[in-house]
């Protein structure tokens, strides 16, 4: 993916990481081999939870379904992501709150700050709101979903891994997640 993007003229690639209440991002990027890849290809990484990154209040063009109720003080997103193309790199796996996790759930980790777990009771509506935000702030959205190993069980952390050797790719976040769900045995409709 990196070499192809660079051949096509995308030379300002950046790895984006956000904080989580459960996993140390610096440990995760090493254990998941992300750091190896970014180092090998000279891709700089941005850590959105570091103080130098500004989070700005986002005002949607149309009313939110739920985010304004979960965050009555305002919905804040990373300023650095506004106006940037985005390539999500999710994995094929199940999720204890959302059934599966994929491209749309990947935005959950990037666009919402540390208290994003507050949205779990309304997660499906939250994902719709996040897709709306993405479509408004990113000129291009693409996902390459890694199914070389797919996980099932009470994910995303307590997984049973299965070798499946598939890759999915799409500019349609709903479609790629629907295909992933179907491949995992769930009815996406």
Spans of model-derived segments:
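N-terminal and secondary-structure boundary signal
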Residues: 1-189
